[in-house]
UniProtKB/Swiss-Prot annotation:
GO terms for cellular component: exocyst. It comes from the Eukaryota. Component of the exocyst complex involved in the docking of exocytic vesicles with fusion sites on the plasma membrane. The keyword Flavoprotein does not apply. The exocyst complex is composed of sec-3/exoc1, sec-5/exoc2, sec-6/exoc3, sec-8/exoc4, sec-10/exoc5, sec-15/exoc6, exo-70/exoc7 and exo-84/exoc8. Belongs to the SEC6 family. Keywords: Coiled coil, Exocytosis, Protein transport, Transport. This is Exocyst complex component 3.
Amino acid sequence: MDVDVEEAALEQVAALLQRPDQLEKLPELKKRADRKKLAVEAMLRTGVQGQLEGIRTAIAHLQTASDDITAISQGVHDIRERLGPFPQLKEKLRELRDANARHGQYAAAMENLKHIFNLQTTLQEIRDALDDEKSGGNLLLAHKHIMDLERARDELLAEVHKMSGTNTEKEQMLLVNFFKGVDSVVAELSKNMWFILGRTLEMVKGNEQGGGPQQVVTCLRIVEREERIDKFYMEARSKNSSAFVPPGRPRNWKEKALRSLEKTVSNRVDGNQLEDRSLNKAWLARYLEVCKNVIMDDLQLAKVAIPCFPPDWQIYDRYVHMYHTSVCRRLREVASEHLEKSELVQLMSWIKFYASEDMLGHPKLRINAQAILQDSPVLSRSTLNQLCDQFVEMSRDDLKLWLKNTVSHETHDWYKNLRPSEDNHGYFYTDLPNTVFGMLKDTVTLAKEVSVEVIPSIINLTIQEFNELAGKYRDAFTAYKTDYFAERSKYQEFTSNIIAIANNLHTCIESTEKYKQQIRLSMEGEQNAAAAMTTPLASGRRTAVRQQQLIENMDALNTKWSNAASVAVNYLREEVITDIAPSLVEIFSKKWLTGSAALETVCMTISDYYHDHKHLRPVTRSTLLMDLQFRIVSEYLKAIETKRVSLNSYEERALAGKRMKADVVRLDNLYAEFATSSDMADQLPLLTSIVAAAGDVISLKDKSLLSLEATSFARKFPNCPAELLSAVIATRDDISGSEARSLASEVLQHVQFHPKDQIFDQLFALRQQENSERLPNLGMANMFKADFMSMLKRDA
């Protein structure tokens, strides 16, 4: 240890004397070290002195403690000696103690002798008071007598309870049997009280004879007294498990009073159903309406009854809770039964109304209806989902039946040769679109009564059923068309009926598009709310559907309507083509070349049919007229390609070119006449220019200019097939087939990058089809949609 101290001292000195100039401070450093040493020594002396003082004090305390222990031991010994005689004293005083107990019992008996001797008289007075209750009420007097008798009985029983002996239980039974009449009048009193409290609202309203609200207050005062007595004995029992508690306690009359009120409320809700489905189809609506009136009236009376009840009862909140609980229980029972569609709608509509400001949320009632329904909804989410699914399935069955009957009725009218109705624009129509989409509107209106969540499912199932309807409708008018072509004279109104069908389908497309726009707008409006929603409202429902899926299904439905409309227009075209087919065969033939009136017959036939076709909607009419124009112009091209006529001289070629141009003028005039109708917003595109251009190529006199004329033809129709152009050129008598093909290929190669008119693509494709094949409808679905959107823009 000395070595460590020495090393530490050397290190300290080395740290202080690191530079030569620090040696000058050596005397000062020595003085500082001496002062520090003296201070440390003084601190050590002080510490040692304090320890010594503490030791002296401890020794003195130990001496004092020893003396105290000796004194206490002596005192305890003296007390033990003095208490020695006490056990013998207890035995000597036993008789005195027993005498004191008997004296207490006798004193209690003497004090209650009046009640004991007058027990039967008092019981009769109580019964008389209870009997008088109907004419004014003496419930307080009856209860006073009962309390007197109970006090006498309980004091005697308490004295017996204090005794410890073999006869204690026997004496208790003797007293209980003696006072058993008290229990009967207590039961009678409580029965009267529960009757009065059960009619609290009628009492408050003043519809009952007697004291009215005063009787209610009397009953509540008695209940409060009994509650205080129960509390006294229960607190005594909680402090001492062997404490005396009178028989029949606690009575819990407050709980029984509330149970009486709850039973009355339950009866008020359940007892309003006076009929069932067998007696009245509207039984549920009538029952719910009565419930609504009863609940509103009773809750307003409950507010009036608040002053009659103690504040801690919170009677108004209890009434609200009891009515809500009873309503929930009853409606759950109704929901579990097999409900018809109208009953289901009435139930769901009433549940929505239940929380509205017209009922539970009425300002006068001052009830937080939303909080109540959040804590205890009328129907569970699973039950609501189940009811919504039931409604969807019921609606599906109804729609199937309605749509089937609608198509059946429509078909029946066709075969009766009834002319369709005309609207204010002169367009034929039937009631099918209004009926069909009226069903959708009515079903959606009902769905709103059920739940907003079920509307997408209803619209979706309606779309599905409309898809089936479109197919069945198409099959029905296809069968009608087959019967017509089998015996045309039998069905005079075929054309007008098919026109009405096409117009109906156009109306269906418009209506579907309107609903689709409404759904799209609702999707945009609800996008933010849907993004913030953690759980979909329709989660757990079997028939739930996304709105985007609705849009896609509606597009598919519109395609189905459009296809059916195309078929209807095709049947109108087929009817015309059947009549003009013999004349079409004569076009660009020897007979035509020599002056046949084939085209004039065609034009007159189309013009004659136009008297019916003008009752078509403009878009559909344009499609039909364009179909017919396709058919006529394609007949020229087909005749040229099949070499229906051989032109052996310039004179014949010139005559053919002249006839072709004359036919073009006739067709153009005919279609110009059609386009002048007030409802034809746009001119009908004409295809006849290709016939005139072909006539120019055929009738050209100077062969040296043929290449130039062919180039001009190719520039006008750059998408013309090489086979068709070579056939036009080869119709001339001064050029061979190989030369025609070579020239056609050459000129078309020069114009391959020129802008092309797509309408001629359809024409060129059509020329290859047989007469019986169906013509394309120019993308009718797209035309209908574009026309509808343009009408919307014009309206805006």
